[in-house]
């Protein structure tokens, strides 16, 4: 199964503050994940002050420039892992160095697989989706292929 591991933002991450020791520990941990064959992709995110949010309401789109106030709901970084179970992902996250200089939360969410859409789309479309997914995995440059 594939999971997204989500590091929640904090006041420090939103201020763009990085602790060099925490960064070095995370770098070493990521190397361990890659060597174990767990890590597929991932990166830290810039503070929301450098981003935007698009709100959908029917056919209307409203753009709000960052920063965004509700820090506990924001994401500071993410990783995509391939694990055998949710418990394996939990066990790896427990080994995480704290990604911020403050208390922090890390969320784990399984990714939907093409089979999760059975009953919503036709079997033919499921095959097309699987082909698209394979092409995405095999591409060069930025993307999932960079951690092969």
Residue ranges and their predicted role:
Residues 1-148:
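Conserved, structured core segments of small domains
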